[in-house]
Amino acid sequence: MATELDKIFLILEIAEFIIGMLGNVFIGLVNCSEGIKNQKVFSADFILTCLAISTIGQLFVILFDSFLVGLASHLYTTYRLGKPVIMLWHMTNHLTTWLATCLSIFYFFKIAHFPHSLFLWLRWRMNGMIVMLLILSLFLLIFDSLVLEIFIDISLNIIDKSNLTLYLDESKTLYDKLSILKTLLSLTSFIPFSLSLTSLLFFFLSLVRHTRNLKLSSLGSRDSSTEAHRRAMKMVMSFLFLFIVHFFSLQVANWIFFMLWNNKYIKFAMLALNAFPSCHSFILILGNSKLRQTAVRLLWHLRNYTKTPNALPL
């Protein structure tokens, strides 16, 4: 029987699911229609579309996971059900995070400017570098999946206290192994965060340098390049903020689930954890001029449609 807390948790999770679906479906439809119309797919649109598709898959996994935790939490600790759900969530989360990181790096090389030869060399080979990052993310996904599988197997043994002999004799050893595996998982999650943070820092340096050059040339501090810098910085900063909340919520959720299994507290951690796939799409829409203009036109048409009287004149 669902409690009041379970009902509130499910309502909030459904709201996050709807919000995330609206934003990501919109991004996917706009980019696909533009690609069909222009008979050409740009790199940024391709990454955005892949990110939207990956996030949509993650949102469905999150919704199923939420109903499982909210209505049948006792089934979560079973090997046959808990393990595949956690593995599937981890795969979609890994892809979403790395695609968002690649998008941040792409915008950095597209907008920022440094006269250094290394930057110009990387910028010239930007598409190939993005492909290499995605290949690296796939290798890390395989490594993470193997580590996570061992992590889940040990954790479910600890949670299953019916095996008292194993629990009393080997619990300390198992917890030590869990700590090592958890550190490995955290390190691989830190790689995309550090790449995005580096992009943001260089964005800031590029903006400062560009603004100083404009002031020295008496052109003011507002031009198209400056505005592009600022929009991209806001987008990357918003992504990093959500990613930090997402990362720490994931660590807290893992600790609560595998160490305490407190059904009440893990719901709050999941709500914070799932804010990233739900809200990130709207940051992308606001930061992309094409998506932003399309969204404004759509809202304008919807507003006019709602104002149209339904009654037909006699």
Swiss-Prot record:
Which keywords does UniProt give here? G-protein coupled receptor, Glycoprotein, Membrane, Receptor, Sensory transduction, Taste, Transducer, Transmembrane, Transmembrane helix
Q: Which residues lie on this side of the membrane: Cytoplasmic?
A: 29-50, 123-127, 209-238, 287-314
* Membrane-spanning residues: 8-28, 51-71, 102-122, 128-148, 188-208, 239-259, 266-286
Q: Please tell me whether the keyword Transit peptide is annotated for this protein.
A: no
Per the record, ranges on the Extracellular side are 1-7, 72-101, 149-187, 260-265
> What is the membrane topology noted in the UniProt record heading this document?
Multi-pass membrane protein
The role this protein plays is:
Receptor that may play a role in the perception of bitterness and is gustducin-linked. May play a role in sensing the chemical composition of the gastrointestinal content. The activity of this receptor may stimulate alpha gustducin, mediate PLC-beta-2 activation and lead to the gating of TRPM5.
Ranges in coiled-coil conformation? none
**What is this protein identified as?**
Taste receptor type 2 member 42
Question: Any additional notes?
Answer: Most taste cells may be activated by a limited number of bitter compounds; individual taste cells can discriminate among bitter stimuli.
The compartments listed are: Membrane
Which organism does this record belong to?
Pan paniscus (Pygmy chimpanzee)
List glycan-bearing residues. Answer: N163
State the encoding gene. Answer: TAS2R42
